[in-house]
Amino acid sequence: MSSAWTLSPEPLPPSTGPPVGAGLDVEQRTVFAFVLCLLVVLVLLMVRCVRILLDPYSRMPASSWTDHKEALERGQFDYALV
């Protein structure tokens, strides 16, 4: 009995799987879409942060800091000092 490998003369049947360079499978497309969504969220957050840094007081309503100051001046928050 010989231990040498011999090639069969008949051709191999074509594979039923996708070709090697055909594209992305389902898991890769899902990961790609998820990463793309994360990048979009990151860009939106960066734009928002830059806009806040450039003009921080335009995003703050005037009533949130003027009313609070008036309340402190009226002495309504004396219990907070205890």
From Swiss-Prot:
Protein name: Cortexin-1
Transmembrane helix is among the record's keywords: yes
Gene Ontology CC annotations of this record: membrane
Keywords, ordered alphabetically: Membrane, Transmembrane, Transmembrane helix
UniProt subcellular location: Membrane
Topological category with respect to the lipid bilayer: Single-pass membrane protein
Record region (Disordered): 1-20
Protein source organism: Mus musculus
